[in-house]
């Protein structure tokens, strides 16, 4: 029987209708966060898709030292708290160090471990101590079966509810490729699997001082992943991605999200028909 992670009234499982994890890459301010959350809550309510809001208070692994990192943990968590209380939606955000975990867990329902940090034992242990759901993004350098070691660490530290995320694998320099077998392989670990459709089209460092991306392939990869069968779809969105402070080339345009989600619901239903 496939593992199901429960979060409030949301059930996250590989055999269940997919959950949407979405929001802007980084927190840009209170007004922008509330604007985005309102749009996303209305859309997901209309389409009857379970929704978890995602945005980062710090982009600690920017390509360049001059890249905009975000509003910081104190201001960021305050903004996420306002989003959570105003729209009654669960929150997921990244943690980059052990010291951030307890404070972040006061607001976030899910702690996300970035792909570059997925093997950091001390960080995994600190996240585990919060008692929250821990969502780990598979490193671009890891085979999907190597996530068994991450699972063992988390379970050893007492984590009951784990989510794994596929976000592409290194394919030469400045490029990623999505191996859809990874979704099935990680699901065999009895962990709900999420597909990150926007970071999978990244071209890391591809613009020299920043990361490039091929937004035009987001929908294609999202359809492929949904056809395999996933617990969640992770897509970062922005009303004006070309002018976003980070990951603009990868993020979906907010105006295009509805049409894509309608298609993904159809793929998801067919894939999971008994």
From Swiss-Prot:
Recorded metabolic or biological pathway in which this protein acts: Carbohydrate biosynthesis; 3-deoxy-D-manno-octulosonate biosynthesis; 3-deoxy-D-manno-octulosonate from D-ribulose 5-phosphate: step 2/3; Bacterial outer membrane biogenesis; lipopolysaccharide biosynthesis
GO CC terms in record: cytoplasm
Major location (coarse): cytoplasm
GO biological process: one example: keto-3-deoxy-D-manno-octulosonic acid biosynthetic process
E.C. no: 2.5.1.55
Signal peptide (from-to): none
UniProt-annotated location(s): Cytoplasm
Protein name: 2-dehydro-3-deoxyphosphooctonate aldolase
Species: Rickettsia peacockii (strain Rustic)
Gene responsible for this protein: kdsA
């Amino acid at each position: 029987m496939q593992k199901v992670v429960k979060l409030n009234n949301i059930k996250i499982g590989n055999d269940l209708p997919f959950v949407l994890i979405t929001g802007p890459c980084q927190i840009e301010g209170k007004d922008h966060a509330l604007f985005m959350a309102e749009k996303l809550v209305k859309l997901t309510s209309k389409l009857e898709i379970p929704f978890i809001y995602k945005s980062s208070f710090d982009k600690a692994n920017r390509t360049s030292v001059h890249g905009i990192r975000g509003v910081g943990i104190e201001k960021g968590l305050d903004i996420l708290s306002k989003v959570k209380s105003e729209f009654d939606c669960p929150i997921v955000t990244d943690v980059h160090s052990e010291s951030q975990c307890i404070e972040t867990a006061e607001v976030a329902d899910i702690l996300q471990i970035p792909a570059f940090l997925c093997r950091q034992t001390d960080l995994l242990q600190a996240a585990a101590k919060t008692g929250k759901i821990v969502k780990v993004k598979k490193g671009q350098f890891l085979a999907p079966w190597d996530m068994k070691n991450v699972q063992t660490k988390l379970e050893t530290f007492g984590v009951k509810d784990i989510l794994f995320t596929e976000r592409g694998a290194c394919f030469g320099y400045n490029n990623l490729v999505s191996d859809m077998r990874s979704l099935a392989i990680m699901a065999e670990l009895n962990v709900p699997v999420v597909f990150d459709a926007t970071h999978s089209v990244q071209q890391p460092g591809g613009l020299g001082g920043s990361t490039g991306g091929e937004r035009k392939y987001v929908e294609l990869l999202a359809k492929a992943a949904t056809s395999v069968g996933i617990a969640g779809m992770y897509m970062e969105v922005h009303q004006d991605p070309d002018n976003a402070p980070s990951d603009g080339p990868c993020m979906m345009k907010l105006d295009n999200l509805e049409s894509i989600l309608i298609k993904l619901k159809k793929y998801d239903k067919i894939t999971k028909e008994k």
